[in-house]
Amino acid sequence: MSSPYGKVDEREHVRLEARRKTRKNIAIIAVSLVILAGIVIGAVFGTMAHKKSPETVETNNNGDSISVSVKAVCDVTLHKEKCFETLGSAPNASSLNPEELFRYAVKITIAEVSKAINAFSSSLGDEKNNITMNACAELLDLTIDNLNNTLTSSSNGDVTVPELVDDLRTWLSSAGTYQRTCVETLAPDMRPFGESHLKNSTELTSNALAIITWLGKIADSFKLRRRLLTTADVEVDFHAGRRLLQSTDLRKVADIVVAKDGSGKYRTIKRALQDVPEKSEKRTIIYVKKGVYFENVKVEKKMWNVIVVGDGESKSIVSGRLNVIDGTPTFKTATFAVFGKGFMARDMGFINTAGPSKHQAVALMVSADLTAFYRCTMNAYQDTLYVHAQRQFYRECTIIGTVDFIFGNSASVLQSCRILPRRPMKGQQNTITAQGRTDPNMNTGISIHRCNISPLGDLTDVMTFLGRPWKNFSTTVIMDSYLHGFIDRKGWLPWTGDSAPDTIFYGEYKNTGPGASTKNRVKWKGLRFLSTKEANRFTVKPFIDGGRWLPATKVPFRSGL
């Protein structure tokens, strides 16, 4: 069946094709400039610091000389010793430029992850450990996919330099997230095993991320972002997208119809997904008729560009009840889990009915790049919405929960959403967010923009906080949102103790409502009351590169503040 987007996409394609060809050539030249700049900077700083010939400024543990490029690259990493050890021993290291060193670093990381996979595969034991080990195997497989993405895309000239850097940082951030999730998924007695086998690959992933972040800053210093990424580069009428979405009924042009009463092609969503072609660039539209579908659904990583559209967020509902207390790892509890890139859901509800006593029980988990959710509901208690990894956008959605009910380590923007804390278990307090950034060079965080945060029911006797820092570099901002008076005046809660790491980034900007006063907020170094310039970093266009991919989804969005 023909796609409702065909005519619009074709028109945009024709309009942009000539510009893309020009941009491709410019981007290739720009990448070369970045590489050249890296060599020059490495040579200058290396020579100044050591007063030696620019060819050799350092030696490794074996007494071998290290080139200025290796020195420059490794100096920006968090694990310098590991960097010198791996890159310094690269074949012809002295003749490699920073881009070649970056690619070599990624290849070594892939080799280390492969070793870890073999170690996990050979350590399967009792049934409980097998569940977590299999989860780790899946996560490490995703890690390798993302590392391979960096190798296949780093020479692709069909994007601007800033877009290229953002892609690479996203995939490397996700690779780090998947490895961390693997360790956290293991039973406590197995975590030392996981940490020891993933130590090398985790450090190498961090180093590769640091290198590409550094090269991105060099690109900025050459003003490449300003030249190559301007509003003229993407001539898209966002309001036209809104009109098309409102005027086009995707249900009438669906490729597959799911209905509990048998009036569709299939009775379950899981069965419908089996018809999705692998890695297809064409949209596959699945219409889910009204009803409650009791199934745990997984959109596999090879299921690209799937649209799931329902009859309404309170009418077409996917319901599950997997939870941690009954023996399922958090990563596997999701009622609806998304791993296929380019996924979109509209007018759907996702519920986990396990209840508060079952603790972690995810309604929706998203671990796929370039995903959008429009007019959807995610309803559970603890850990409702798992924004696990990659770039994600939520528009006019409703998220209901109690403890850490928006959590994960993706780059996510929630815009014009309703966020509704509900009554938790007796003795619990509500925390809306728990962001999981573990590395300063990751480009991840949770951005809550123009949302309404209000209680679901009477919560006057329940302490409710905007969030707590799950990891040392936790990054969360709340901007231009309405905050009901039930929000505790301190605003934020420590994960442990009475403070938070200085390295977190929590921000508030121009919020309104009785809960928005910052007068009595916690006095943390990492809590900032943002300027307009700072807040703009966390809007759709710069934070999730939304101007590049959201227009094609036809989901309405605000690109800036």
UniProtKB/Swiss-Prot annotation:
Keyword annotations: Aspartyl esterase, Disulfide bond, Glycoprotein, Hydrolase, Membrane, Transmembrane, Transmembrane helix
A GO MF label: pectinesterase activity
Active-site residues from the entry: D383, D404
Residue ranges of the region described as Pectinesterase inhibitor 24: 64-211
InterPro entries for this protein: Invertase/methylesterase_inhib, Pectin_lyas_fold, Pectin_lyase_fold/virulence, Pectinesterase_Asp_AS, Pectinesterase_cat, Pectinesterase_inhib_dom
Additional note from the record: The PMEI region may act as an autoinhibitory domain and prevent untimely PME activity during transport.
Protein's name in the database: Putative pectinesterase/pectinesterase inhibitor 24
Species of origin: Arabidopsis thaliana (Mouse-ear cress)
